[in-house]
Amino acid sequence: MVEFRIPEEISAFFDDEYGKILLVKGAPGSGKTVFALTLLSMLKGNGAYLATRVDPETMYKQHPWIKGEISAANIVDAAQSVRVQKAKEFTIKPLRYTDVPDFLKAIYARTESMEKPVIIIDSWDAVVSYTGYHAQKEREELEHSLCDFCRRTKTKILLLAENTEQTPLDYLADGVVVLESVMYDERRLRRMLLQKLRGCQIKNPVRLFSLDNGIFKSFIELKEEEEKEIAEPHPRAPIPDISDRRISTGIEDLDRVIGGYGTFNLFEGEYITYDIIARALSLNALNLGRSLLFMPWQEQIDRLMPFVEPKYRDNIEAVEDIKDLKDRIAGERRIIFINMEEIEDEEVVKAVIAKIRDHGDVVIGFTGADRGRGRFDFFASTHIRTMFISGVPCVCGEVPRTEIHALELDISTGNPEIRLTPIV
């Protein structure tokens, strides 16, 4: 199943009867075309995609999911000669723009029978060049005519542009969004900036998004109280160990990314994201019948009890002093959580961790970004960095090395489940 997600502000922007223009700006490779295809797919065929650089056959090969979502009749070759598919499933009739009236008539011909029509032009710069309106004054006249046309005919037009600088079109357009693709510690990071959406409230002006599987998917801020909204909480079937040496993280997606947890697992960075992941492990381990040991006690563990089998709810202990932890390392294999931010004596921590590893217990250690690097990572079997990006909890692996992944909380099953999506 293909999962789309467009920011709710943009969905609201298109969900009325008025004609308007949305200008989508971004450098090559920033995701403009995928965003446009995803949006048009969500509109259930009420629109047309005018491309000047990619023919429909190639587009279907690059984005296989759109063949079942967007009909060939709605993909228009705006600059090339007539193309007929070899299998003769469909014919693409080109639109030859020699002047402004013909250009507008061609658009109107594609939309006059549509309900709430939407036209996507990729790219506006190429179309303007093809029409021969190279002078700045002529281009501005064309853009004014296009704005007037869309309002008179109640047509919504989405213009894709690679010029990220501010131009007169920014003022004419009803909405302006900018897509960014930047490097973050040698990893891909994608953001959408909602600069203007006339008539719509912008709740979050910056949206983290991914193009995973060639689909545009934006992420929303995680609600801190979302778990409390579960009406009938109940335990879920736990995920078994990965192997004799690796246990499950309690998150299926994270298991696939890092292969589970080893003996010492270091989390470095932002605490709230770490806490989300630690709670997932706690629930899974408890429902497998394992015991947990915390140093120090974490108050938020109490709210996990509704999701734990009653017979396992007493399998939790706590110690307040790291030195007391050595005396508790005996007997069955346990999972031990250590907040190293609250411990000053680094050598004692290392000694305790070494003893725990020898016993075969699993250690989950957290430290802030300022203190973590270089202190414990040299003997970590897993090293995960935690962060918040545009209000979204994210992780990336140092050992093993991974892309940035966005975390989402799914409570639809009556149990908090974490899903990960790579930012690619």
Where in the sequence are the language-model features?
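Conserved P-loop
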Residues: 21, 27-91, 271-322
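Phosphate-binding/switch loop-helix module in NTP-utilizing enzymes
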Residues: 84-151, 315-366
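Short, structured coil segments at secondary-structure junctions
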Residues: 43, 153, 171-174, 288, ...
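Charged, amphipathic alpha-helical linker segments immediately N-terminal to NTP-binding catalytic cores
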Residues: 194, 198-242
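Pre-Walker A adenine-sensing motif
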Residues: 1-15, 248-260
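Phosphate-binding/switch region of NTP-binding enzymes
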Residues: 156-215, 367-424
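Pre-Walker A (Motif I) flank of P-loop NTPase domains
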Residues: 17-22, 261-266
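Extended amphipathic alpha-helical coiled-coil/heptad-repeat regions
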Residues: 262-269, 296, 312-424
